[in-house]
Amino acid sequence: MNYAVKWEWNRHCDQSAGQKVKSGAPISSLSPYCPQLFAELTCSLQIGLQSADPAVAGGVGRTFDREDFRRKVMLLNDSGATFGFDLIYGLPDDTLARFREGLNFALSLYPNHLDIFPLAVLPGTAVGNKAASIGLQHLPEPPYTLQQSPSFPLADMAVARRLGAASDIFYSRGKAVAWFNGVARGLKLQPVELLEHFGDWLLAKQGRQCDEAEFDDAAIWQLQRAFLTQLFTERKLQKLLPAALDCVDYHYAYGVALMAVPPIPPDDEQLLQLDLLKMKLVRASSLTLLPFHYEILDILESGEPDLPWIAKHLKQSGSWAAIYPAHGEVCTESLIRPYYRLLEGLDGKQPSGQVAAKLKVPADDALELLQFALAEGMVTGW
């Protein structure tokens, strides 16, 4: 097997701070020590899977051992490394059924993202040289995209294109890796079927094929919520919906916090000198406040989402959480509702003590919360 891994990280040194560094190697060369190294770096690996079908891979001069590939990828998963797959549809002898099955396999390995695109029949390559003889019809000019083939007709290419767009929007841009397979199991669907349902739903909703560049992250989050609400309802699985939405909501907020730059908090000495109740504090832009159906910490502690288990064993007691970056990681604080509402009310327009008084939060309690929130970078304005 020779499926190349490409990686990129930010290299920090005196003369090249922030420089992007790219390199690559066959995935077969990954030792048990490499994944942990990748996990410790600011590094994203892109694995050129191309096709998960051994016969299709063999047609372009590759060998593919699924179990060996799975073992190597699980090393990456176990280490916490960030990685994605490149998948191509329309290779010689590829079919829509084979592509769907390969996508299902790829999703089962929990990649952080998937890049899916049609075959480019490049001149001078092995595939390009035999394209005419095996019936590959493609654009005559760059990017030489395959239009159809004997095994992958035009209509099937359109279906694969819609699947690729659904994956881009719902899975990759939607940062769904942590909950996607668990939600699919809760719906009693194969992962690829969940994407197909989303692609069909989005086409009906928008009236046309959409591209992920049309949506910002917040819009994709709302699309995920609306789609899943409808699908769980249609499949008469409403009792599992609250747990599914809690997972979707949390990981959206986690993704926001992961990319956010927190404010610089005061040091301990400065903090003690501030009269916080008289200050017009404001929520930091890096803070996300969200309500949940369940105690969100219980869901996080339960591991990969098992929606039936959550619905059966956990109580929908409700929780209110602050999700934010601090100390080089994403932090999650489960708050009592008055504290949540106090943070929610900090808009920088009125003294924080007035906000607390309106919510009937005792001044001493409010001060303790605000000191913690300011030290953690949840609020700013000092």
Where are each of the predicted segments found?
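Long, charge-rich, low-complexity alpha-helical segments
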Residues: L241-D267, C331-W382
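Conserved non-cysteine loop/helix-boundary elements of the Radical SAM core domain that shape
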Residues: M1-E141, L146-F152
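Hydrophobic packing positions characteristic
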Residues: Q209-E329
